[in-house]
Regions:
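N-terminal exported-region signature
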Residues: 1-190
Length: 190
């Protein structure tokens, strides 16, 4: 017996995507917008292990040359920004699902955040959930300050794959994308 069209709702038709992370020799500020099945640093970074020197966020680090018990970064995620140091220019491909959106807890002051989106949006719209608490958001080359006239802001579109420093005046929740959207990716809450 053939099923009806309503039976199709039980299936998940999302497909995986491949994120390409371009890394230059030295330190890079990056983020991931895909979630692989296994987000352990050793697994995700396996293709570049010979060139990887270290990856770290604000609280943890992973160095492939160290014994496993000295590495405190045990899982990567789409919410954090990461400093990645490589010995030479290399490209990393990460295959996984793109979340529909994410809710991230931010603390008063500077936060190292990821950008879990497959396409870029204007900072003014992406930061709307934080209201007037946003002081500045910046990556290595561009910045956005809501108190400045638009022509002084060099960050006009947030770029997938980059990490960002976000400064806020109080603790809050930053909602990126549509966390209630269904069928187009995983919903990520922190």
């Amino acid at each position: 017996k053939l099923g009806s069209a309503t039976d199709l709702a039980a299936f998940d038709f999302r497909s995986t995507v491949v994120q390409e992370v371009s890394l230059k020799a030295g330190w890079n500020l990056v983020s991931f917008y895909v979630e692989a099945d296994d987000m352990a640093p050793a697994t995700v970074l396996e293709p570049i292990k010979d060139k990887l020197e270290q990856i770290k966020n604000l609280t943890s680090s992973y160095d492939p040359s160290l014994p496993f018990f000295l590495n405190t970064l045990t899982s990567l995620n789409v919410k954090d920004g990461y400093w990645v140091k490589v010995s030479e220019t290399v490209s990393l491909e990460v295959e996984g699902m793109v979340p529909a959106g994410a809710s991230m807890t931010v603390k008063k002051g500077w936060n190292l955040v990821g950008y879990p989106r497959e396409s870029g949006e204007a900072p003014v719209s992406e930061l709307a959930s934080l209201g007037s608490t946003v002081v500045q958001i910046k990556n290595l080359t561009k910045s956005y300050d809501p108190a400045l006239p638009g022509f002084l802001n060099t960050l006009t579109t947030m770029e997938p794959g980059l990490g960002y420093w976000l400064k806020v005046t109080e603790n809050g929740t930053w909602t990126v994308g549509d966390v209630s959207e269904s069928g187009s990716g995983r919903d990520i809450a922190k």
